[in-house]
Amino acid sequence: FAVLVLFSTVVQAQSLDKLFRKYADDERFEYTSIGKGMLGFASIFADYSILTEGQMEKITGFKMLKLEKDSAYQELAEKFMNDIDAIIEKGDFETSLVKREKDRRIYVYKRVDKRANADMLLLSKSNTGINFVWLKGKTSDEEMDRIQFEKERQAKEEDIL
């Protein structure tokens, strides 16, 4: 069973990697990737648990894709959103935040495996473009306990129904 859980976590992370590789070299996208070394250096100046509101204690990877909306890119924007939606749906992500403004939508999704490895996705859609950010790292012990408690509570509710 543990091997199956580990395998599914690896496959899900590969799906995110595959999505970023797919669009990273496309000239119509702005792509940013910050590796573990640079993030380690940045941690000297910033507390990641504060920046992520306690959800991530350590960030080991940061990737961002940005697509400016243009009528010529409408089909590409739809395909990009379909790819993102598929990853979120298949990846067992929990919705942490949904914010709707007049001309913009912001979504934050997260998932944590049994070893406290965490992925946080930030998606911003507006009339002018799409921004998709992937933060990879470790969650805090407190957040891990909260997630475990929430999963147990949901399982009990499902048993009652």
What are these regions (language model features)?
Residues Y109-S140:
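A short, solvent-exposed beta-edge/loop patch
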Residues L65-R104:
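Mid-length scaffold segments of soluble, non-membrane domains
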Residues Q12, G137-L161:
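C-terminal partner/receptor-binding element of secreted or periplasmic proteins
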Residues R21, I88-D92, R146-E152:
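Contiguous interface-forming segments/domains that mediate binding rather than catalysis
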